[in-house]
């Protein structure tokens, strides 16, 4: 694991008009490997990895709120006040939503102006056709070249993320984007949501049994992967990218996903 958390993934010379830094939150693996493959994003990019990757079982994390609260501290070591962008692949997008809400309600000078969900499935979709079967080992991604010890840790991390996502109590946002995004106007009133962009994979994860569906594709029939059921209008823009959930960061697709993340950062949504 890196010594620092967050890790500086891409640097940018300091300037008066530099764009808000992007903090990418780890996926369900707890690692940042995929984000280091990205091409230049035109701003300072940090990555947060799971400091409890080596822990067994639930690993000390009791909830997504628990993780989000812990991750706010290292973010504030880098950026105490001002505006940031949060994003993440899969589980990292879910964590980004929770972190953004906690920062919005704390009112302590740091706010999230935009969230980028990279094929993040809304885990609490209530629709009957979106209900998933219990996770099975063959639903996990192939891990070629990974030794057994690391493979076991990755599988533990994946199951931990699945368990916590299934128990997540999604935060409440106001229904309109008025005033300063990512802030709460009054104590006890739901905060104004940041801008949110969803990058969704075009393809389904291939399964050996054609009758089976990967759990991460259970909301693929919905334009916003289920986020429309958390709150209508929360996701403002959807961008389709090549590949399936597990392959969007593969070499064949890395230039495309880089371009889509840059577009998500630069879109004028005001």
Sequence positions of predicted segments:
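A hydrolase-biased, glycine/serine/histidine/acidic-enriched motif that marks catalytic-domain neighborhoods
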Residues: 1-270
């Amino acid at each position: 694991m890196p010594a620092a958390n967050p890790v500086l993934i891409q640097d940018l010379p300091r300037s008066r008009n530099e764009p808000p830094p992007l903090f990418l939150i780890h996926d369900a693996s707890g690692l940042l490997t995929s984000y280091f493959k990205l091409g230049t994003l035109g701003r300072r990019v940090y990555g947060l990895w799971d400091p409890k990757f080596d822990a067994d079982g639930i690993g000390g994390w009791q909830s997504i709120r628990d993780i989000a609260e812990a991750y706010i501290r290292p973010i504030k070591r880098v950026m105490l006040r001002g505006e940031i962008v949060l994003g993440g692949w899969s589980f990292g997008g879910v964590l980004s939503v929770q972190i953004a809400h906690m920062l919005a309600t704390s009112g302590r000078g740091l706010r999230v102006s935009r969230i980028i969900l990279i094929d993040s499935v809304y885990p609490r979709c209530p629709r009957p056709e979106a209900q998933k079967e219990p996770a099975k080992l063959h639903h996990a991604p192939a891990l070629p070249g990974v030794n057994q010890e690391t493979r076991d840790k990755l599988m533990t991390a994946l199951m931990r993320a699945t368990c916590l996502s299934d128990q997540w109590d999604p935060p409440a946002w106001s229904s309109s984007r008025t005033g300063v995004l990512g802030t709460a106007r009054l104590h006890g009133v739901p905060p104004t949501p940041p801008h949110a962009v969803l990058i969704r994979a075009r393809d389904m994860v291939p399964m050996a049994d054609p009758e089976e569906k990967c759990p991460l594709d259970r909301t693929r029939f919905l334009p916003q992967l289920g986020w429309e059921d958390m709150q209508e209008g929360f996701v403002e823009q959807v961008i389709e990218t090549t590949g399936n959930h597990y392959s969007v960061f593969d070499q064949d697709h890395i230039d495309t996903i880089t371009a889509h993340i840059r577009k998500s950062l630069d879109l004028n949504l005001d």
